[in-house]
Amino acid sequence: MHGYIGHTDYGWWRYLSARPGIHEVNFWRPGGRRFAALSPGEPFFFRLNSPINRIGGFGLFARYASLPVWRAWEVFGPANGVDDERALLERLGRLARRQVGPGDLVGCVAVSECVLFEADEWVNVPATFRPQNLSGAVIDLRIGDGHRLWGECLERAAAVPRFEWVAEASDRLRRGQPQMVMPRLGQGSFRLRCSMPTPAPVR
């Protein structure tokens, strides 16, 4: 079993951590870059960018699609980590260093069953992880620092009542048998599954 450590913008994390009712998020990728690092149910860890460089939470990978920005906003809304479509376009434009329009593609990584930790619960990034990796990196959760990371994240998630699956996942980890958990699909993942890229509407 593997997980993925994704470089996470602190503003995105702060926005979503202030909204505990959002359980599924869009970890978007500028330019529609494909994401094929995980299978559904494997953990996606949110590594807060430098100077923080710690794990601020995690969720379970649900699915990926490349969509026009306007459609990504329709599908996920505030789960994109911003208040409105204009703010999403501005955030994407800053990262891409160019103007981004509603019809431009954005990669949508749907992450379900999310828990974002308080600052005093942040988890240390594995020593083998190299922040200079462009977008993130896969880590083996069966051994070493990956095993430690998954265990510490499960400990923190155990305090969240809606995570019924945590007890079984923790037990399997203690027995040296980490196992994927099939994520409960939220509205975003359901809409993502039904989405086909279409031209941007006339505005």
Annotate each language-model stretch with its function:
Residues 38-66:
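Short, well-structured hydrophobic secondary-structure segments
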Residues 39-41, 104-105, 197-199:
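Short, well-ordered loop/turn elements at secondary-structure boundaries
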Residues 1-10, 57-68, 192:
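N-terminal short leaders/motifs
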Residues 188-203:
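Short cysteine-rich loop/turn motifs with clustered Cys
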Residues 1-40, 48-52, 115-116, 121-133, ...:
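Compositionally biased, charged N-terminal/linker segments
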Residues 55, 60-135:
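Aromatic- and Lys/Arg-enriched surface recognition patch
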